[in-house]
């Protein structure tokens, strides 16, 4: 994948760029693997906004991605197509299994049309193959990693993501996540070999607000720029800093909100670097 830069023909074009989509081999999805995706506009079943800055955007269909693959152990599959997915930053690969089944998976780097992939404990260590962590050599780069055995891939699914298997002790494997955190994961959990493709995604310059609106992202307005009726930070004579701890429009504390005594914290070997310690 590469990045195509636009010439500055208009203010919105100046500096903006777009993916060149050279790896895409098919423009329409497999009909049997798509489902309707109605827009919610960031609202719940009562109509209340639960996620701000969402609304509008282009219509989408949801592509069903196989994040487990355990039911296809030992069954070879050919990569029929590499496709664009509007619901994620990574590309997706359409697999045609020898038993006639069709499935989508996250497309790893260096996987191309016509390649063969497989799943199972005896699969080769090559991009696109899915194995339990106990069968993957230490030092291997993986993606689409399960947190619980059989629970489906939860980590390392976005464009360019890679997780390294750094050690294995007893029933746990130690993984270095993209954030720098090192975490214990059950060796029965499965992972896919290789890093996620489309790594240049993070270098795209969207150029104008309108392109974000096409994606369904609405403007983010600072609370201190609002009136008191709209936000606890609003109002004041002239420019003010808010005068209180950061809160959301409902008055609830914002910022560092991660629970320090989360049950899964015991599996963290080394925390990710944050704030002043991030170097």
From Swiss-Prot:
Q: Does the keyword RNA-binding apply?
A: yes
An example of a Gene Ontology BP annotation on this entry? cytoplasmic translation
Q: What is annotated about its quaternary structure and interactions?
A: Part of the 50S ribosomal subunit. Forms a bridge to the 30S subunit in the 70S ribosome.
Sequence similarity: Belongs to the universal ribosomal protein uL2 family.
Please provide the record's keywords in A-Z order. Answer: Ribonucleoprotein, Ribosomal protein, RNA-binding, rRNA-binding
Quote the biased-composition stretches of kind Basic residues, using this chain's numbering. 50-59, 269-279
What does this gene product do?
A: One of the primary rRNA binding proteins. Required for association of the 30S and 50S subunits to form the 70S ribosome, for tRNA binding and peptide bond formation. It has been suggested to have peptidyltransferase activity; this is somewhat controversial. Makes several contacts with the 16S rRNA in the 70S ribosome.
Question: Which GO MF terms does the UniProt record name?
Answer: rRNA binding; structural constituent of ribosome; transferase activity
Looking up InterPro entries in the UniProt record yields:
NA-bd_OB-fold, Rib_uL2_dom2, Ribosomal_uL2, Ribosomal_uL2_bac/org-type, Ribosomal_uL2_C, Ribosomal_uL2_CS, Ribosomal_uL2_dom3, Ribosomal_uL2_RNA-bd_dom
> Keyword Cytoplasm: yes or no?
no
Biased-composition ranges for Basic and acidic residues? 253-268
GO CC field: large ribosomal subunit
User: What organism is recorded for this protein?
Assistant: Pseudarthrobacter chlorophenolicus (strain ATCC 700700 / DSM 12829 / CIP 107037 / JCM 12360 / KCTC 9906 / NCIMB 13794 / A6) (Arthrobacter chlorophenolicus)
Q: Which PANTHER family would you find in this protein's record? A: LARGE RIBOSOMAL SUBUNIT PROTEIN UL2M (PTHR13691:SF5), RIBOSOMAL PROTEIN L2 (PTHR13691)
Q: Which named protein is this?
A: Large ribosomal subunit protein uL2
**Region of interest: Disordered:** 1-59, 224-279
Q: What is the lineage of its organism?
A: Bacteria, Bacillati, Actinomycetota, Actinomycetes, Micrococcales
Q: Which HAMAP family does UniProt cross-reference here?
A: Ribosomal_uL2_B
């Amino acid at each position: 994948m590469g990045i195509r830069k636009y010439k500055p023909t208009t203010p919105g074009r100046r500096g903006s760029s777009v993916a060149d989509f050279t790896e895409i081999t098919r423009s329409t999805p497999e009909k049997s693997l798509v489902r309707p995706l109605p827009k919610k506009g960031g609202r719940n079943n009562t109509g209340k906004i639960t996620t701000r800055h969402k609304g509008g955007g282009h219509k989408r269909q949801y592509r069903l991605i196989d994040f487990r693959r355990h039911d296809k152990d030992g069954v070879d599959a050919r990569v029929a197509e590499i496709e664009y997915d509007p619901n994620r930053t990574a590309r997706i690969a359409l697999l045609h299994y020898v038993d006639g089944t069709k499935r989508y998976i996250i497309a790893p780097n260096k996987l191309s049309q016509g390649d063969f992939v497989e799943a199972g404990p005896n699969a080769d260590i090559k991009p696109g193959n899915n194995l339990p962590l106990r069968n993957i050599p230490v030092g291997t780069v993986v993606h689409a990693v399960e947190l619980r055995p059989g629970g489906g891939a939860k980590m390392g699914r976005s464009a360019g993501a890679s997780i390294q298997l750094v050690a294995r002790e007893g029933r746990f494997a130690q993984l270095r996540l993209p954030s720098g955190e090192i975490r214990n994961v059950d060796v029965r959990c499965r992972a896919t070999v290789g890093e996620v493709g489309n790594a240049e995604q993070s270098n795209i310059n969207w150029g104008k607000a309108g392109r974000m609106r096409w994606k369904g992202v609405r403007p983010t307005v600072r609370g201190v720029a609002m009136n008191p009726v709209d936000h606890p930070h609003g109002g004041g004579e002239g420019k003010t800093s808010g005068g209180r701890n950061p809160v959301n429009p409902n008055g609830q504390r914002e910022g560092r909100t991660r629970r320090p005594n989360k049950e899964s914290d015991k599996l963290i070997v080394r925390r990710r670097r944050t704030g002043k310690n991030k170097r």
